[in-house]
Regions:
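Glycine/tyrosine- and acidic-biased, solvent-exposed loop/turn segments at the edges of beta-strands
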Residues: 2-106
Length: 106
């Protein structure tokens, strides 16, 4: 059974130590994102999912800014994006066993 628009699942927030864990849902009831907030800003590891339940992205926030390695899954490709203070530093893409650099921003 799927959820109708009127039965859409509301986000869930739970306190875990000094962080607030957040779970957001797609309109079909599947998890859309799981992550943490600190001082009302995204902080720590975040994971995003497609409506099918398959992982679409994972990465790290520090005080609301994307930082470090992020991975994005699209069809048969894995895209790695390196962030520093919410700015893209480097992008790599893998297609099966082939790796190629897409962009470097230094």
């Amino acid at each position: 059974l799927s959820l109708s628009a009127q039965q859409k699942e509301a986000p869930k927030f739970t306190l875990e130590g000094r962080l607030t864990k957040a779970v957001f849902y797609h309109d079909n009831g599947e998890i859309a994102q799981i992550g943490y907030f600190k001082n009302k800003k995204r902080h720590g590891n975040w994971i995003s999912y497609y409506r099918t339940g398959k992982k679409s992205a994972t990465g790290l926030y520090r005080s609301g800014l994307k930082t470090g390695q992020w991975f994005f899954w699209k069809e048969n490709n894995l895209i790695e994006v390196i962030y520093k203070d919410n700015k893209i530093v480097n992008v790599l893409e893998w297609n099966n066993s082939e790796k190629k650099m897409i962009a470097v921003n230094e």
